[in-house]
């Protein structure tokens, strides 16, 4: 069987959606997560579901149920391109190795300073502006290789007040 992620990505080429993840879950569930500039609508999920159902049938991909959805507000970030795309946003990262006895940091992501031609030769160094202690803002510099997992971490205001 071909690489399921690559097959799915190829099937979605030209559909104006970005493949975020493909996951096999219990009881034959195949979960596909997509994203799109401006947000994913139900029509996008329906269109992707129809397309993938046909492709998976032709490619003999074994599944009982296909679920297509958006990554939600706490979208995972797995590539340098995704980190660059969400520069300026609040994210949470978990480091592979602890720094000052701590692995999890939340703050505002800044784009790498070494963007450009040199970025191909060396991994991009991103910055995360976080509050170490009350009113003590620090910047953590990291590469994608330092990160075990990263995700968007928006501050949601359910009271309806503007900040």
UniProtKB/Swiss-Prot annotation:
GO cellular component: cytosol
InterPro entries linked: Ribosome_maturation_RimP, RimP_C, RimP_C_sf, RimP_N, RimP_N_sf
SUPFAM superfamilies named in the record: YhbC-like, C-terminal domain (SSF74942), YhbC-like, N-terminal domain (SSF75420)
Coiled-coil segments: none
Keywords for this protein: Cytoplasm, Ribosome biogenesis
Domain of life of the organism encoding this protein: Bacteria
UniProt-listed Gene3D superfamilies: Ribosome maturation factor RimP, C-terminal domain, RimP-like superfamily, N-terminal
Pfam family, one: RimP_N
Signal peptide: none
Subcellular location: Cytoplasm
Single Gene Ontology BP annotation: ribosomal small subunit assembly
Family: Belongs to the RimP family.
Function: Required for maturation of 30S ribosomal subunits.
PANTHER family, per the entry: RIBOSOME MATURATION FACTOR RIMP (PTHR33867:SF1)
Protein name as annotated: Ribosome maturation factor RimP
Organism in which the protein naturally occurs: Bordetella petrii (strain ATCC BAA-461 / DSM 12804 / CCUG 43448)
Record gene name: rimP
């Amino acid at each position: 069987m071909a690489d399921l992620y690559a097959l799915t990505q190829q099937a979605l080429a030209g559909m104006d959606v970005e493949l975020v993840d493909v996951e096999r879950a219990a009881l034959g569930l195949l979960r596909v997560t997509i994203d799109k500039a401006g947000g994913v609508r139900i029509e996008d999920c329906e269109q992707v579901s129809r397309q993938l159902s046909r492709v998976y049938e032709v490619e003999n991909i074994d599944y009982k149920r296909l679920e297509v959805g958006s990554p939600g507000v706490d979208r995972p970030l797995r590539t340098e391109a995704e980190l660059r795309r969400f520069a300026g946003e609040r994210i949470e990262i978990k480091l592979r190795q602890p720094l000052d006895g701590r692995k999890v940091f939340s703050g505002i992501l800044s784009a790498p300073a070494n963007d450009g031609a040199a970025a191909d030769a060396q991994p991009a160094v991103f910055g995360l502006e976080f509050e170490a202690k009350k009113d003590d803002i620090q910047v953590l510099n990291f590469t994608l290789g330092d990160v075990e997992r990263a995700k968007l971490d928006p501050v949601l205001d359910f009271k309806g007040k503007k900040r």
